[in-house]
Structures are given as C-alpha cells and as structure tokens.
C-alpha cells in the first residue's frame, strides 16, 4: 500500500489536521496534545450530532483517543470562503449557508451524550461564549484567510 501524510490548515483550536492518502482514497487524521485528548471526543460527538441532523460534517472512521488522534472522513480541500471567492453568483451559496444556520438553531441537544466510555455534557451557550467566538473570527479566521 502507498501512504502519504500531509499537514493541512486547521481551525482555531489546538488540534492538528493531516490529509492521509491511501492509494487513491483520502481521510483526515486529527491529533491533539495529550492533555487535550478529550477535545477529540467532543469533536466526534459534535460531528455525530451534525450528521444526525442532516448537516454535513466529517464522519468518524476510527478513534485512537488513547493515542491522542482519530481518523475522520475527508470533506475535500475547499472551504466556504474559497468557494465564494471564485464564484461570480454567490446568492445561492449564501442561501444554502442561511439554511444550514437555521438547521443548527433547530437542534435540540440532549443533557448528556455518550461516546464509548465517555460522557459529554455541553455547557449552556452564553453571551460570553458568543463574544469569545466572535473574537475568534477576527483574531484567527480573518488573519489566517486574508493574508
């Protein structure tokens, strides 16, 4: 078998992402520092919630939480930002995005989620959380994508 691993850009977290190419198929390896491995479990639960609500998110292929990593499906190399930069007619893309935001708002979270032996409980989303995440947009996303 022919394997190739290439680091790819990540998100505003401490996770690292790598594209794994096995023959002609790709997947994503996500790793975290040892003390942050539980974040991988939360990441998996969030993706599972999104998928169960018909919102496209990576699917868990295999977990190696004890080794601070997991393998997820590869959704491709294009971000929403990349797509709207190259398109002339962006209206349909923005309409799709608004539909996704509406779907996100309709999700009713359970009190607890289970992933293997782990129980995950999401804290209540507060105005303070909103401000922190809004700051991420300016501090991380804009700096990263508008270089």
Model region roles, listed by residue range:
Residues 1-4, 42:
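Short Pro/Gly-enriched beta-strand edge/turn motifs at strand-loop
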């Amino acid at each position: 078998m022919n394997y190739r691993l290439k680091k790819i850009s990540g998100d505003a977290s401490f996770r690292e992402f790598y594209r794994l190419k096995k023959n002609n198929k790709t997947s994503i390896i996500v790793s975290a520092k040892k003390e942050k491995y539980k974040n991988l479990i939360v990441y998996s639960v969030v993706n599972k919630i999104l998928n169960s609500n018909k919102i496209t998110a990576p699917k868990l292929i295999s977990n190696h939480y004890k080794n601070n990593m997991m393998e997820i499906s590869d959704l491709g190399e294009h971000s929403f930002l990349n797509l709207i930069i190259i398109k002339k007619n962006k209206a349909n893309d923005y309409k799709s995005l608004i539909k996704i935001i509406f779907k996100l708002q309709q999700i009713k979270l359970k009190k607890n989620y289970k992933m293997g032996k782990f129980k995950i409980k999401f804290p209540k989303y507060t105005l303070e959380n909103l401000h922190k995440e809004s700051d991420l947009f300016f501090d991380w996303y804009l700096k990263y994508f508008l270089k």
